Amino acid sequence: MTQDELKQLVGQAAADYVNATVPEGAVIGVGTGSTANCFIDALAGNKARYRGAVSSSLATTARLQTHGIKVFDLNEIDSLPVYVDGADEIDRSGAMIKGGGGALTREKIVASVSDVFVCIADASKLVETLGTFPLPIEVVPMARTAIGRRVTALGGVPVVRVTKEGVPFITDNGNEIIDVKGLRISDPRTLETHINAWPGVVTVGLFAARGANLCLLGTDTGVETIEYSKG
């Protein structure tokens, strides 16, 4: 299967999982990116079952609204039974690198209040050690250079994310992103805590403190379900 076919496969599997496990009338948390879009498209066929969704980005909001799915502000919602999102990398413990699409902060917020985090990914995203994919850090613009120096001291190579026009990429929150290359992340939870404590960091794209509960992994032989123990 092509990568796009694998994304569609896990998007449908996630919709099937949500339809089978989430009660009618619930509000669902939805992530950002091409794999999350496949989930939205698959979920749309059964949208009447749900009150709506909480979105993690402006792009996801637009996708949901295109399908006629009501989008709620997180402040309006008491609970989210499930959050479904992709990952740039996921390891055997359920820790992830996320933020390739630039929505890491809102993704982390929505994930943090969900009961179950379902990661959907193709098999290429499953790794033994995180770090081959550059680690995104959302930063307040005035702190960009200072954060870059701290990254270098860790042994990483900081690269300011830019648009195709060559100007800094700006997140939905009005901040910039540093992509860190060259890290081998053996202890993602500790590194997440460490980087998040730097002044000027909005959040780092490590999802270890709140990792996935479940991964639906698209392979050439079908969808593999990986469950992670949390505690």
UniProtKB/Swiss-Prot annotation:
GO cellular component, one term: cytosol
Molecular function GO terms recorded: ribose-5-phosphate isomerase activity
Catalytic residues of the enzyme: E107
Residues bound to substrate: T32, G33, S34, T35, D85, G86, A87, D88, K98, G99, G100, G101, K125
Sorted UniProt keywords: Isomerase
Any GO BP annotation: D-ribose metabolic process
Reaction(s) this enzyme catalyzes, per UniProt: aldehydo-D-ribose 5-phosphate = D-ribulose 5-phosphate
Cross-referenced Pfam families: Rib_5-P_isom_A
Enzyme class label: isomerase
EC numbers for this chain: 5.3.1.6
Keyword Nucleus: no
CDD domains for this protein: RPI_A
UniProt pathway: Carbohydrate degradation; pentose phosphate pathway; D-ribose 5-phosphate from D-ribulose 5-phosphate (non-oxidative stage): step 1/1
Subunit structure: Homodimer.
PANTHER family per the UniProt record, alphabetical: RIBOSE-5-PHOSPHATE ISOMERASE
Role summary: Catalyzes the reversible conversion of ribose-5-phosphate to ribulose 5-phosphate.
Family membership noted in the UniProt record: Belongs to the ribose 5-phosphate isomerase family.
The name this protein goes by in its record: Ribose-5-phosphate isomerase A
Name of the gene this protein is made from: rpiA
